């Protein structure tokens, strides 16, 4: 059976959050001291994850993305990847990139080709400020390692007005020199602030004016509140901006 929602949209893409734990403390995500975590008995083990994934694949899901928290800090991540790789489905993963170098071989062995890396700034100082960890160089080097090993890399960047919105063009310029794509994600604070889509989209649409190939991720932003604009290496003009 095909999974269809009330708007008649067919769903073939499943996201599985493997853990709520993370080795960063991003300011927009959690306080410096962390958050209360669920007991281990409330977290799915690898057999349960496989059983759920198998059921969805049998119901026409063709792609599964593993997320967190930080999925690569699960101690049984290699077992999970191996079991899911046995299913007829495309596997992808979203990570903060800190421990990627430890898992490159396993990711390759399990035919994971598409990896999204969360990186909100190209400044080492800003990275430390927003993540409360001094790991920028590690993450950036692991992105280069992914490229070297032939993975398809997409960078997810949360744009925060007054913090890193001045880096939009720097992010985009990077696609001229590295075979990567960028996806800008809106900042959605947890304090009840109203989201102003007109204000956000105006800032993001500066990119097309500079000659970059951009793709709006969904015409109706009501259904696309977290993915607004994707900047890719395709069609990029060979010039500085």
Over which residues does each language-model region extend?
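Radical SAM/AdoMet-radical enzyme domain recognition
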Residues: 46-66, 73-173, 177-178, 183
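A C-terminal junction/extension of Radical SAM enzymes
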Residues: 168, 174-177, 181-241
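Canonical Radical SAM [4Fe-4S] cluster-binding loop centered on the CxxxCxxC motif
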Residues: 7-46
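Short, conserved loop/turn and helix-capping segments at secondary-structure boundaries
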Residues: 43, 133, 197-201
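N-terminal [4Fe-4S]-dependent radical SAM core
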Residues: 1-15, 25-27, 58, 234-239
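Short active-site-proximal "capping" loops at secondary-structure junctions
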Residues: 33-35, 70-72, 98, 221
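Flexible loop residues that form catalytic
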Residues: 34, 69, 120, 187
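A short acidic, helix-capping loop that chelates divalent metal ions and anchors anionic groups
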Residues: 34-39, 123-130, 191-195
């Amino acid at each position: 059976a095909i999974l269809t929602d009330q708007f008649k949209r067919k769903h073939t893409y499943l996201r599985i959050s493997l853990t709520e734990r993370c080795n960063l403390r991003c300011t927009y995500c959690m306080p410096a001291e962390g958050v209360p975590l669920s007991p281990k008995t409330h977290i799915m083990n690898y057999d349960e994850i496989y059983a759920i994934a198998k059921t969805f694949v049998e119901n026409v899901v063709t792609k599964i993305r593993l997320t967190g928290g930080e999925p690569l800090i699960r101690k049984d991540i290699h077992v999970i990847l191996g079991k899911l790789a046995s299913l007829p489905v495309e596997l992808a993963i979203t990570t903060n990139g800190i421990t990627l170098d430890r898992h490159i071989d396993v990711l390759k062995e399990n035919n994971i080709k598409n990896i999204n890396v969360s990186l909100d700034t190209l400044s080492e100082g800003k990275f430390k400020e927003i993540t409360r960890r001094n790991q920028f160089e590690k993450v950036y080097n692991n992105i280069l390692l992914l490229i070297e090993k032939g993975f398809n890399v997409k960078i997810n960047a949360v744009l925060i007005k007054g913090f890193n919105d001045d880096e939009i063009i720097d992010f985009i310029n990077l696609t001229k020199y590295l075979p990567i794509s960028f996806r800008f994600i809106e900042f959605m604070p947890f304090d009840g602030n109203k989201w102003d889509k007109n204000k956000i989209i105006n800032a993001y649409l500066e990119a097309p004016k500079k000659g970059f190939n951009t793709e709006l991720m969904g015409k109706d932003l009501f259904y696309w509140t977290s993915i607004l604009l994707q900047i890719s290496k395709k069609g990029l003009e060979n010039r500085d901006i």
